[in-house]
Amino acid sequence: MRSPGIVLLLLLLLLLPPGAAPCPADLCPAPPRVNVSLDAAPAARWLPVLRLFDPGLLRAAVARIVGDRVPKWRDVIGKLVAEMESFLPQPYTKEIRGISDFLNLSLADGFIVNLAYEASAFCTSVVAQDSRGHIYHGRNLDYPFGDLLRKMTVDVQFLKNGQIAFTGTTFIGYVGLWTGQSPYKFTVSGDERDKGWWWENMIAALFQGHSPVSWLIRTTLSESEDFEASVYKLAKTPLIADVYYIVGGTAPGEGVVVTRNRGGPADIWPLDPLNGAWFRVETNYDHWKPVPKSDDRRTPAIKALNATGQANLSLEALFQVLSVVPVCNKITVYTTVMSAATPDKYMTRIRNLS
């Protein structure tokens, strides 16, 4: 008799185009896992991690991303950042200052590259509940420049008083988080909501005190005490850009997709397992609208989840769902699966289909 794992793998294989197969997690490399002490001064807390990486690689990544993603009038942004540094959100601006000084970059370029990441994160996120009421959360992060970013991806354990306060996955030099977990409380991921990117509006909102979307994830992981509090903070805090926040908790039913406008929530889409809605899939499109045929990652993910079945759901099964092409694609940088109820099982793997 075949084991449930073998049956699941065979079912997923049927969903794939020729030549595309799930990648077992143990065959995909894990990123470095590093510690960042929040008890250290903001300007110094990333320095031990930075010393583990080639500074030339990091400077090259900044130059490439800024050159490709940032408007030609970035000099104007640089002047604004220099003049308004003391008014920008903390501790993040001080952290960027410390990183920039270490890499011999201007604060403006360090700041701009952090904002550039906010604009281009294409993603797939899934929050789901198994038949026993356990909550699982997974995400793929897709981004151009994968040749650089795969070398810069890290799992970060943020420490307070020597203990893990929360965990997140990010790129070296980027102080925000698109993926994270507060142990025994909640998990969260962010997916870009593309409403047309206007740097002018983003900068204006920033100087009005609105939060970058990835900084709010990190703040929420640091400050919110439970699933409900995290959803409220993620739904209500003014932002510099639209986004989808996907949140998973520890109790049955604790899973939601929050569709955000800059000023507040556009939609709240919770799990509804009693009525058969045991998972939610969010890519980069409003869930109540059809996805464009040119970028349909939603349908393959839904098919893979239904093929898996609620009774067979696990972190490994969710990893396989996120391995189905085109959910996993040539610009997928990493996959993370997590469950706040079992925080030690937080797992990230680097993907490289190119």
UniProtKB/Swiss-Prot annotation:
Pathway linked to the protein: Lipid metabolism; fatty acid metabolism
Predominant cellular place of this UniProt entry's protein: other
CDD domains the record matches: Ntn_AC_NAAA
InterPro entries: Acid_ceramidase-like, Acid_ceramidase_N
Gene Ontology cellular component list: lysosome; membrane
MF terms (GO), sorted A to Z: fatty acid amide hydrolase activity; N-(long-chain-acyl)ethanolamine deacylase activity; N-acylsphingosine amidohydrolase activity
Domain of life: Eukaryota
Post-translational modification (record): N-glycosylated. Tunicamycin treatment causes a reduction in specific activity against N-palmitoylethanolamine. Autoproteolytic cleavage at pH 4.5 gives rise to the alpha and beta subunit. Cleavage gives rise to a conformation change that activates the enzyme. The same catalytic Cys residue mediates the autoproteolytic cleavage and subsequent hydrolysis of lipid substrates.
This protein's UniProt keywords: Autocatalytic cleavage, Fatty acid metabolism, Glycoprotein, Hydrolase, Lipid degradation, Lipid metabolism, Lysosome, Membrane, Signal, Zymogen
EC number: 3.5.1.60, 3.5.1.23
Sites where a glycan is attached: N35, N104, N306, N312, N352
Reactions this protein catalyses: N-hexadecanoylethanolamine + H2O = ethanolamine + hexadecanoate; an N-(long-chain fatty acyl)ethanolamine + H2O = a long-chain fatty acid + ethanolamine; N-dodecanoylethanolamine + H2O = dodecanoate + ethanolamine; N-tetradecanoylethanolamine + H2O = tetradecanoate + ethanolamine
Site (Important for enzyme activity): R139, N284
Top enzyme class: hydrolase
Keyword Signal included in the entry's annotation: yes
Membrane topology type: Peripheral membrane protein
First and last residue of the signal peptide: 1-22
Family: Belongs to the acid ceramidase family.
Protein name, entry field: N-acylethanolamine-hydrolyzing acid amidase
